[in-house]
Amino acid sequence: MTKTVIYPGTFDPITYGHLDIIERSAVLFPQVLVAVASNPTKKPLFELAERVRLAEESVAHLPNVQVIGFSDLLANVVKERHITAIIRGMRTTMDFEYELQLAHLNRALTDGVESLFLPSTEKWSYVSSTIVREIYLHRGDVSQFVPPPVLTALMEKNR
């Protein structure tokens, strides 16, 4: 069985920071599943189907990366798809505290599937979807933070 890792997130929108984690994961693991989450507690800039499409277009150059959308509990997706590990990007110590709690929870819910933390590269350590949305909503230039498909979608949304 091929070892597949999952990189979950809302990716609203997917950024170069996310893409960096995905590209590095694609070098380390035979199969990477990018799982775009529907989060009912958040009001997304892009609907789930659009976020999945933007993620697919952004990772098209990576043959061992697949993108799915999901609205189920992450642990259920992990078990159904026989995932080997959960990949999480880490920018700050605040991320670590939150992610560590999720890692413990996911390990319990998945019968032991581990979470692996990849630190962000310095270049992208300050980039988040939240920051990109804020800049975009205030009519700022986000071109240096998002892949071309996302920039195009944002420009079309702004018309």
Curated annotation (Swiss-Prot):
Substrate binds at T10, K42, L74, R88. GO terms for biological process: coenzyme A biosynthetic process. GO terms for cellular component: cytoplasm. It catalyses: (R)-4'-phosphopantetheine + ATP + H(+) = 3'-dephospho-CoA + diphosphate. InterPro entries: Cyt_trans-like, PPAT, Rossmann-like_a/b/a_fold. Homohexamer. Keywords: ATP-binding, Coenzyme A biosynthesis, Cytoplasm, Magnesium, Nucleotide-binding, Nucleotidyltransferase, Transferase. It comes from the Bacteria. Its cofactor is Mg(2+). Reversibly transfers an adenylyl group from ATP to 4'-phosphopantetheine, yielding dephospho-CoA (dPCoA) and pyrophosphate. This is Phosphopantetheine adenylyltransferase. Its EC number is 2.7.7.3. Pfam families: CTP_transf_like. Signal peptide: none annotated. It comes from Mannheimia succiniciproducens (strain KCTC 0769BP / MBEL55E). Belongs to the bacterial CoaD family. GO terms for molecular function: ATP binding; pantetheine-phosphate adenylyltransferase activity. The record marks H18 as: Transition state stabilizer. ATP binds at T10, F11, H18, G89, M90, R91, E99, W124, S125, Y126, V127, S128, S129, T130. It is found in: Cytoplasm. Pathway: Cofactor biosynthesis; coenzyme A biosynthesis; CoA from (R)-pantothenate: step 4/5.
